[in-house]
Amino acid sequence: MLLKEYRICMPLTVEEYRIGQLYMISKHSHEQSERGEGVEVVQNEPYEDPVHGQGQLTEKRVYLNSKLPSWARAVVPKIFYVTEKAWNYYPYTITEYTCSFLPKFSIHIETKYEDNKGSNDNIFESEAKDAEREICFVDIACDEIPERYYKESEDPKNFVSEKTGRGQLKEGWREAQEPIMCSYKLVAVKFEVWGLQSRVEQFVHKVVRDILLIGHRQAFAWVDEWYDMTMDEVREYERTTQEATNRKIGVFPPAISISDITLPSHSHGGYSSAPSTPLATDAPEFLSVPKDRPRKKSAPETLTLPDPSQICLNVQPGAGNKPSLAKPE
């Protein structure tokens, strides 16, 4: 298992981000979906936990086949999806990703939100005090994103909000920005396959980081669209957008079953921690196969069988009457 803690600061308050996150996830999922591909919402309903109180439980199916690299599409079923389950007791959420086609693969994300600059080094002390983890700051303004996802209108260095006056974030913006909040995400990636574990886990973390960066950039760039919304209004937007997204994707036969996740004993809850983002179309270098690799010859090109007339069947006494092949004398 590879554990990393991501810290993503936003020029918002924790309460503002609660609305912005819901809006961003719904809009992004709808934009990224098309016939046969995208994010299908299976369940989204209130949920009560005896420890954390009122929350929200969501379950989604992320259909990925055409978004997979070509090397992966060759070995997975035609209709392939990942199950996302999330439990939200904002400002604390948990999101889990599993896939029955890859039973040894999982992603587990714990998220906490605070009104600070990402300065709390002990926010996950109880959950990860004995675990070794890397801390990664994600800068929505200055970190590079994959070129195919760049939009000038969603660039925090250029964007200025008409409703809040916030924007044009420059290098070092976190030091003087008010208001500011931080999304702390403890991400555990597990791929227990000998020989591939460390490389695949590193690759998945890179994808997760890109998703977090793109999603948080969009949440801020769309602030004028959601800033005046109430919780009831964003819930209604979420409901209607999810219905439209499900219709856009279409109905799928149960071609591959996804392993059910039983609610943990501590019954966490949450919304989707991040939207889905298409993966690269080429295999990572460590999984690439040389195109001109010579074919190994482990046997002769043709196999010559002996002439049956030159073989007779001998039964030797005392050998348990087991027949043997032998050449005639």
From Swiss-Prot:
GO terms for cellular component: cytoplasm
Q: Which terms does the UniProt entry file under GO BP?
A: signal transduction
Question: What keywords were assigned to this record?
Answer: Cytoplasm, Lipid transport, Lipid-binding, Transport
Signal peptide range equals none
Q: Where in the cell is it found?
A: Cytoplasm
Location of the region described as Disordered in the Swiss-Prot/TrEMBL record: 267-329
Checking SUPFAM superfamilies in the record gives: Bet v1-like (SSF55961)
Q: Which reaction does it catalyse?
A: a 1,2-diacyl-sn-glycero-3-phospho-(1D-myo-inositol)(in) = a 1,2-diacyl-sn-glycero-3-phospho-(1D-myo-inositol)(out); a 1,2-diacyl-sn-glycero-3-phosphate(in) = a 1,2-diacyl-sn-glycero-3-phosphate(out)
What this protein is reported to do is described as: Catalyzes the transfer of phosphatidylinositol (PI) and phosphatidic acid (PA) between membranes. Binds PA derived from the phospholipase D signaling pathway and among the cellular PA species, preferably binds to the C16:0/16:1 and C16:1/18:1 PA species.
Q: What is this protein called?
A: Cytoplasmic phosphatidylinositol transfer protein 1
